[in-house]
Amino acid sequence: MNAIVGIQATVDANNHITRLGVTCALCHSTVDNSVMPGIGRRRDGWPNRDLNAGAIIALSPVLSAEKKAVYNSWGPGKYDPRFNLDGKNTPLVIPPAYGLAEIKNETYTAEGPISYWNAYVAVTQMGGQGNFSDPRLGIEIQHSPDMVTPKLAALRAYQHSLPAPPPPASSFDAAAAERGSTLFDQACSTCHVAATGTDNNSGKLHAAADTGVDGAYAARTANKAYRTTPLRALWQHPPYFHDGSAATLADVVAQYNRVRAIGLTAEQQRDLVEYLKSL
């Protein structure tokens, strides 16, 4: 694995990993390619959409052929944080970890604040030696000493310090974006509220049918519904929706226009896309 992703693992006589140097940055950091493709200044918080975590996991010699097929099906930029617990396969697009300072609940399904998800991933996915408990999911993991919980506050503070990146110069049509801003206020701001871009800060969740997205992943979670996703730096991280089912922002706008019967013309949809690119 060191040759593939730059992390090292130690295994025992049964080929079980006993130590692995995996961190949040594996999935939530990339580089600006300023030296050459794949080499440059680090960009923490940016989703690593080149990472094929499933293919890496599938290299394990102790996995069954059936499980290897599941892991290999995910593709680059996706990960299923529940497959090892419930055996169901609905991988998610790796989300950004920037712009979270004003966001109440992390994750697509808003099961808890950022430290909740950090603990979940550290303990249930990364093999961290710590505690995680969620009776809603039937998870109760205790480890002594707890080496995860004491680190959560500092990790949260660092993540809260990561701003959403502004759009590159000349990456959108400013006049169209201005028209799109008016359309956004009329058609989208009920759910994408104020500066945070989400109504979940007030506790709101949405059934999959409300947005036309697949509900299989939400059904596996504690809330059984989706959070309105914040919109800052949308330009940076296609594809969209939790499962990557929308390749472009134009696809996103077209889907909501259809599902919510908003009635935008083709020109209005283009203007709205330019506004979203400006965020």
Residue ranges of each PLM-predicted region?
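Electron-transfer interface patches adjacent to heme c in soluble/periplasmic c-type cytochromes
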Residues: 1-156, 160-177, 182-279
